[in-house]
């Protein structure tokens, strides 16, 4: 049966929305006193509104449910069928997909809180979580804001102010400029005085937005303007500060909690050094290689920082640390962090429960001496992104999604299910995989084992990248720093990854067996004795025969000569190498598995066939093998875009630097696109003259839409 006919039978519209099994209440494997709580907070919180979406909304709802607190969700039009909407006791629409019209619309959220009789609002992280005006708005309306007072958000949210407060409190700070003169000339002058490389950062917000490393005076102006645009878009404030950039530092942060009674504690540190685009990708607790004395000094400095602003609730004090374990205050995030689960795993706490109880007026549940530190935990952030394309964020449907089974040491923190869509309007994080074990090496082995079980089809993800990262010898040794990915780029992002011929044989076997399944199904339903499907069995007249198959790895076609043997096995020849192949397909728990033997080596893989592509997932890794489609069935090829540039993803055109008639050189900036809350510069692929610009500033461009056309060059 032709591969094209087989593919036509795969209907991707028949997606099932499959729920994710989440972590059950943990039974701690180490012998230590676990804190017992009552069923409801000591204050008046019986209903909480979560002013957020995705996995953090689901996370808060689970704890609220455990405590007997009713939950209220809000959602945009894009999130109407989202997981957090289904989980909540009540859910209310608050507007269109763009965040400014929904999740950042303070008046709408306050109105929902009032109409639903919610006594408190949990902001999650991002969106309004560090918005001083929103915290004050809640207070004025008599609604409990589950977070610090607005004054603490103000003091810590403006980085220039926080640096001064920290210095006065005896917290070490980095040399830099935090002044009010925000002219380009003044900032450039101070950068020169501090000495390159420097880091410029938006004085508000976080998440790597509005942040640039500048290594020379030559690139200062371009990077400053780009950082200002991104900061203005994200935080509505383009003011900047400048700091001396510490080369190859570690990013170490401390979880703190304060209450209304003047108490403050630290729950040890997390190492979040390994980052891309200044955003964390893998975190661990405790930080590797930190001795107890440094850990104590870190924690005490973080508590001093919290007390300096009368902090209440969950917060994170971030430090940069040099190779000698000297540390310097960087900023304080006045909210619950994305990576808070690793702290929960090593301390046996529920930090969301602590938030709710402290917001209701209770004291911190444990004294500093009572907070345990046991074992080691990792969190890997699973993103819809393409690591091979500078970690370009992606969007699209989760056609297939299967995860490792949650257990007492494995958590899946997510807000999506199979069949859901990763939206272009929001952050592309799919899930957080969190694991715990008694020591770092065991936890790392658990992380890699679990990543192998995280299988996603429908859009590109960073799972394979995380496997390479967690398996790198320097990462295993704990030699982490913020330049880890650039330093080990060749190991982590190999340019040419050739699929093993044995894996190609497995893919070919899976396709052949799938063809046999389909032809058998046709045979059962046809009455036409002359139909080729009425007698197709993979063999003819009980004799061997040979066919040629073509599969594709990247842009390279692979020719496989397949001989069907009478005993049901296959001889496959790729180039000059011969393989004896046999196996079968089976269904387990709703998934198709390929059991195969290639030259006597047995293996088992999950087998998925979708959209001209074969996906194989096994404990050895994952592969994708394409099935070439005849040219007369193919859409316009990518070569048709050589005369210009195309949009790498769906987004909004923020700036246009060129017009028709302009001459440009390869690498010149043509446009700036905002997508997935990040700024992407579209650069000229070659020297030439612009013939046409297809989009103006503010316009929405779909993925692969032509942006700029070049004039044809005379030969």
Swiss-Prot record:
Its main location: mitochondrion. The modification N6-biotinyllysine is found at residue 677. Residues 622-711 form the Biotinyl-binding domain. Keywords: Acetylation, ATP-binding, Biotin, Ligase, Mitochondrion, Nucleotide-binding, Transit peptide. Residues 1-38 form a transit peptide. The modification N6-acetyllysine is found at residues 193, 233, 490, 577. The active site is at residue 335. It comes from the Eukaryota. Pathway: Amino-acid degradation; L-leucine degradation; (S)-3-hydroxy-3-methylglutaryl-CoA from 3-isovaleryl-CoA: step 2/3. One of its GO terms (molecular function) is ATP binding. Its cofactor is biotin. The modification N6-succinyllysine is found at residue 577. Residues 45-490 form the Biotin carboxylation domain. The keyword Chloroplast does not apply. GO terms for biological process: L-leucine catabolic process. Its EC number is 6.4.1.4. One of its GO terms (cellular component) is methylcrotonoyl-CoA carboxylase complex. It is found in: Mitochondrion matrix. It catalyses: 3-methylbut-2-enoyl-CoA + hydrogencarbonate + ATP = 3-methyl-(2E)-glutaconyl-CoA + ADP + phosphate + H(+). It is an enzyme of class 6 (ligase). ATP binds at residues 159, 201, 207-208, 251, 278, 318. Residues 163-360 form the ATP-grasp domain. Probably a dodecamer composed of six biotin-containing alpha subunits (MCCC1) and six beta (MCCC2) subunits. Interacts (via the biotin carboxylation domain) with SIRT4. Biotin-attachment subunit of the 3-methylcrotonyl-CoA carboxylase, an enzyme that catalyzes the conversion of 3-methylcrotonyl-CoA to 3-methylglutaconyl-CoA, a critical step for leucine and isovaleric acid catabolism. This is Methylcrotonoyl-CoA carboxylase subunit alpha, mitochondrial. The lineage of its organism: Eukaryota, Metazoa, Chordata, Craniata, Vertebrata.
């Amino acid at each position: 049966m032709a591969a094209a006919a087989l593919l036509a039978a795969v209907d991707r519209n028949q997606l099932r929305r499959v729920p994710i099994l989440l972590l059950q209440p943990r039974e701690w494997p180490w012998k230590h006193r676990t804190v017992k709580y009552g069923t409801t907070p000591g204050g008046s919180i019986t209903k909480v509104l979560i002013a957020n979406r995705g996995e953090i909304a689901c996370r808060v709802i689970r704890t609220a449910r455990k405590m007997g607190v009713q939950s209220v969700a809000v959602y945009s039009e894009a999130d109407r069928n989202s997981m957090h909407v289904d989980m909540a006791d009540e859910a209310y629409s608050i507007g269109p997909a763009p965040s400014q019209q929904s999740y950042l619309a303070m008046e709408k959220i306050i109105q929902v809180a009032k109409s639903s009789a919610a006594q408190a609002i949990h902001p999650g992280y991002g969106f309004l979580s560090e918005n001083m005006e929103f915290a004050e708005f809640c207070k004025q309306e008599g609604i409990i804001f589950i977070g610090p007072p607005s004054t603490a958000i103000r003091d810590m949210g403006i980085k220039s102010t926080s640096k001064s407060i920290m210095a006065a409190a005896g917290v070490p700070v980095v040399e830099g400029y935090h002044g009010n003169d925000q002219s380009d000339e003044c900032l450039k002058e101070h950068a020169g005085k501090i000495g390159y490389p420097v880091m410029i950062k938006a004085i508000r917000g976080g998440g790597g937005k509005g942040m640039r490393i500048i290594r020379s005076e030559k690139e200062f102006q371009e990077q400053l303007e780009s950082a200002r645009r991104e900061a203005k878009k994200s935080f509505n404030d383009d003011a900047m500060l400048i700091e001396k950039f510490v080369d190859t530092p570690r990013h170490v942060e401390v979880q703190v909690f304060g209450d209304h009674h003047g108490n403050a504690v630290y729950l040890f540190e997390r190492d979040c050094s390994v980052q891309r685009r200044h955003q964390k990708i893998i975190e661990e607790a405790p930080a590797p290689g930190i001795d107890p004395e440094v850990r104590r000094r870190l924690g005490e400095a973080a508590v001093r920082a919290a007390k300096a602003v009368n902090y209440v609730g969950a917060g994170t004090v971030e430090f940069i640390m040099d190779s000698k374990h000297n540390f310097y205050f960087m900023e304080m995030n006045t909210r619950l962090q994305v990576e808070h689960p690793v702290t929960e795993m090593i301390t046996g706490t529920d930090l969301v429960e602590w938030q709710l109880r402290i917001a209701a007026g209770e004291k911190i549940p444990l004294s500093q001496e009572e907070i345990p530190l046991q074992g080691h935990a990792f969190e890997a952030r699973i993103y819809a992104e393409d690591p091979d394309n500078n970690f370009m964020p992606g969007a699209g449907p989760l056609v297939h999604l299967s995860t490792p089974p949650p257990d007492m040491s494995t958590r899946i923190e997510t807000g999506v299910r199979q069949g859901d869509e990763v939206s272009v309007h929001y952050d592309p994080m799919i899930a957080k995989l969190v694991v715990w074990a008694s020591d770092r090496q065991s936890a790392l082995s658990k992380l890699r084992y679990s990543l192998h079980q995280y299988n996603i089809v429908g859009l590109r993800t960073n799972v394979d990248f995380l496997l390479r990262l967690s398996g790198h010898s320097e990462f295993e040794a704990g030699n982490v720093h913020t330049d880890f990915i650039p330093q080990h780029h060749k190991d982590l992002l190999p340019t040419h990854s050739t699929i093993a011929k044995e894996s190609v044989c497995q893919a070919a076997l899976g396709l052949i067996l799938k063809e046999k399944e389909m032809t058998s199904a046709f045979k059962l339903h046809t009455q036409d004795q002359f139909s080729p499907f009425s007698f197709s069995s993979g063999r003819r007249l009980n004799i061997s025969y040979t066919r040629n198959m073509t599969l594709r790895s990247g842009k390279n076609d692979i020719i496989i000569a397949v001989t069907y043997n009478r005993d049901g096995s296959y001889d496959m020849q790729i180039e000059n190498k011969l393989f004896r192949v046999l196996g079968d397909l089976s269904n387990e728990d709703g998934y198709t598995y390929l059991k195969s033997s290639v030259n006597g080596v047995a293996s088992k893989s999950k087998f998925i066939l979708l959209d001209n592509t074969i996906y194989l997932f096994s404990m050895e890794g994952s592969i994708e093998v394409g099935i070439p489609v005849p040219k007369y069935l193919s859409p316009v090829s990518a070569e048709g875009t050589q005369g210009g540039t195309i949009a790498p993803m769906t987004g909004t055109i923020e700036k246009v630097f060129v017009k028709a008639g302009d001459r440009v050189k390869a690498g010149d900036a043509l446009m700036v696109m905002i997508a997935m809350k990040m700024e992407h510069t579209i650069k000229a692929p070659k020297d030439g003259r612009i013939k046409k610009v297809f989009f103006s500033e503010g316009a929405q461009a779909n993925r692969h839409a032509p942006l700029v056309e070049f004039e044809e060059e005379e030969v």
